[in-house]
Structures are given as structure tokens and as C-alpha cells.
Swiss-Prot record:
Residues 42-60 have a biased composition (Basic and acidic residues). Residues 42-78 are annotated as: Disordered. The Tat system comprises two distinct complexes: a TatABC complex, containing multiple copies of TatA, TatB and TatC subunits, and a separate TatA complex, containing only TatA subunits. Substrates initially bind to the TatABC complex, which probably triggers association of the separate TatA complex to form the active translocon. It comes from Rhodopseudomonas palustris (strain BisB18). Keywords: Cell inner membrane, Cell membrane, Membrane, Protein transport, Translocation, Transmembrane, Transmembrane helix, Transport. Belongs to the TatA/E family. This is Sec-independent protein translocase protein TatA. Part of the twin-arginine translocation (Tat) system that transports large folded proteins containing a characteristic twin-arginine motif in their signal peptide across membranes. TatA could form the protein-conducting channel of the Tat system. One of its GO terms (molecular function) is protein transmembrane transporter activity. It is found in: Cell inner membrane.
Length: 78
């Protein structure tokens, strides 16, 4: 009951051929193959760009010189 016999597959293939026709199925398979090729080409292009790492930028961690204490010109200390 759970497995499909050869007759089930023949009926399914026959229905698919009747619905889509031989020409549409071959065109569809050609489009699928072309899509797979372009996908693989895209993966290879990504790998080529990943092989060229960007130069590492270093950050200088030295502290800036300490600022002199500020005094307000308008206020006077008594």
C-alpha cells in the first residue's frame, strides 16, 4: 500500500506528458540545466573574490596627549 508499483509511475508519467507535452518538458529541462550552470558559475565567482582578502587596516592604540586644564576667562578665583 505504501510503495508505488511500476504501473503507478507509468500512469503518472503519462499524465505529465499529456498535460505538458514533449516540447515543453524538454524546454523545461534545458532551462533547469542552464540555471544550474549559471548557479555554479556564480559560486566560482564568489570563491575568486573571497580569495582576494582586503588589506588589514591597523588602528593606532596610543592615547592622545592630555589636555591642559581649562580656566574660564570670565570667572576669577578669590
Amino acid at each position: 500500500m505504501g510503495s508505488l508499483s511500476i504501473w503507478h509511475w507509468i500512469v503518472v508519467i503519462g499524465v505529465v506528458l499529456l498535460l505538458f507535452g514533449r516540447g515543453k518538458i524538454s524546454d523545461l529541462m534545458g532551462d533547469v540545466a542552464q540555471g544550474i550552470k549559471s548557479f555554479k558559475k556564480g559560486l566560482q565567482d564568489d570563491e575568486k573574490t573571497a580569495e582576494k582578502p582586503e588589506p588589514v587596516k591597523s588602528i593606532d592604540h596610543t592615547a592622545p596627549p592630555a589636555a591642559a586644564p581649562r580656566t574660564d576667562v570670565g570667572s576669577k578665583v578669590v
